[in-house]
Design a protein with these regions (language model features):
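Bacterial N-terminal signal peptides that target proteins for export
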Residues: 1-7
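N-terminal signal peptide c-region/cleavage motif recognized by signal peptidases
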Residues: 16-18
Length: 145
């Protein structure tokens, strides 16, 4: 009986956090507001505990993290082609995401967790020129909003 009361108290203490968690949808598109081969939106703000779901609206896309663009404590992920991928945000910071087949076309996006700024060296990761230019544009837009 005592153990049940402790378990119930623990669940009640955690309930507000799970109730506040949001699900954020990101579409993988051949064409969107920002041009061709894009994530939409290209910049999202999330909080620890939120889930970001990448939706393969158009075929030929995936979503995966870029080495060196994931905060400590956050798991990297590699989504399969044409498959939905759900990612729980577990650490504050900035997460860089790419569609591997369309990296050279600049198909990238940023998840900002907890209002964090891009850490120094965030754009130092190895990536095609168009991807880096897209990240610079996305970060500038995100800072302005």
């Amino acid at each position: 009986m005592k153990l049940n009361m402790i378990a119930a108290a623990a669940l009640m203490a955690l309930a507000p956090y799970s109730a506040l968690a949001e699900t954020i949808e990101v579409k993988m598109l051949n064409k969107g507001e920002a041009g061709v081969m894009v994530f939409e939106p290209r910049f999202v703000s999330a909080e620890v505990g939120d889930t970001v779901v990448f939706l393969p609206v158009d075929k030929g896309h995936n979503a995966e993290t870029i080495k060196g663009m994931v905060p400590e404590g956050q798991d990297s992920f590699t989504g399969k082609m044409n498959k939905e991928v759900s990612v729980e945000v577990t650490s504050e910071g900035m997460i860089g995401v790419v569609c591997k087949p369309h990296a050279a076309m600049g198909m990238v996006m940023v998840i900002q967790v907890g209002g964090a700024d891009a850490p120094e060296g965030f754009l130092d990761a190895k990536m095609p020129r168009k991807a880096k230019e897209a990240f610079e544009e996305i970060l500038a837009e995100g800072a302005a909003s």
